[in-house]
């Protein structure tokens, strides 16, 4: 049966995902940045309360995946922290200036991760040659690749995802970006073994007082009175679709 991973941005969302049938959680911060490394406090609270596998993302900033020496040092430190806290896996990825896997740096990440299952995230979708990259990741011992098939969403990239699956058994190819209940059957019919979804929506802040027109970010139009939360019903619906597909 296909595995359902839910992207979560808080301990509460991780619990919601777990309670509604998620098989695994990718734990992130900063949804507007596409997911950054969670704080130590969030990592500890999730580790204490969530019982399904949780894989934190290790990504120090938004943007591309070619990092400075200082950023890479932070990545290694965060990998060690996640390992010490007892998480079963993590999500990360590093490219060089030419869009190839930065093999020396990824080797250091794999060594720091030790027995943890490493997912190479959507840095894969920014790589120059996906099949060569997949071979490099297999050589490194990466467990899985999260990809949209190098398109803006996974449904558009499904043909590339199928090509990657046909390329070999390892790493596992996990489809993500825009995967929802309404299009999930396309991925299941294509033989995708793992799917990744945020399964949520932006929710209004409970604050009654609002200083409108004030932004905490460089985006002057950012809505500071909303937050992204996992929708338990959406998770349960996706899990049900997977179970019914398996029973066919």
From Swiss-Prot:
Domain of life, per lineage: Bacteria
Chief location bin: cytoplasm
GO molecular function: copper ion binding
Swiss-Prot/TrEMBL keywords: Cytoplasm
GO cellular component terms attached to this protein's record: cytoplasm
InterPro entries: CutC-like, CutC-like_dom_sf
Database matches in SUPFAM superfamilies: CutC-like (SSF110395)
Assembly information from the UniProt record: Homodimer.
Family the entry assigns: Belongs to the CutC family.
Annotated protein name in UniProt: PF03932 family protein CutC
Origin species: Escherichia coli O7:K1 (strain IAI39 / ExPEC)
Designated gene of the protein: cutC
């Amino acid at each position: 049966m296909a595995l359902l991973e839910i992207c979560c941005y808080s301990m509460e969302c991780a619990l919601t995902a777990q309670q509604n049938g998620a098989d695994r959680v990718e734990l992130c911060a900063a949804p507007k940045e596409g997911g950054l490394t969670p704080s130590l406090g969030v990592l500890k609270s999730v580790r204490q309360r969530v019982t399904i596998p949780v894989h934190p993302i290790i990504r120090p900033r938004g943007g591309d995946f070619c990092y400075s020496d200082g950023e890479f040092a932070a990545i290694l430190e965060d990998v060690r922290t996640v390992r010490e806290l007892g998480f079963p896996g993590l999500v990360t990825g590093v490219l060089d200036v030419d869009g190839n896997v930065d093999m020396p740096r990824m080797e250091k990440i794999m060594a720091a991760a030790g027995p943890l299952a490493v997912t190479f995230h959507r840095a894969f979708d920014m790589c120059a040659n996906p099949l060569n990259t997949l071979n490099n990741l297999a050589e490194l011992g990466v467990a899985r690749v999260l990809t949209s098939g190098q398109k803006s969403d996974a449904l558009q990239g499904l043909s590339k995802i199928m090509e990657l699956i046909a390329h070999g058994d390892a790493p596992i190819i996990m489809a993500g970006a825009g995967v929802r209940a309404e299009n999930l059957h396309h991925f299941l019919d294509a033989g995708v073994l793992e799917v990744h979804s945020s399964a949520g929506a932006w929710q209004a802040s409970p604050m009654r007082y609002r200083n409108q027109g004030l932004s905490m970010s460089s985006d002057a139009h950012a809505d500071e009175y909303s937050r992204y939360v996992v929708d338990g019903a959406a998770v349960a619906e996706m899990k049900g679709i997977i179970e019914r597909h398996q029973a066919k």
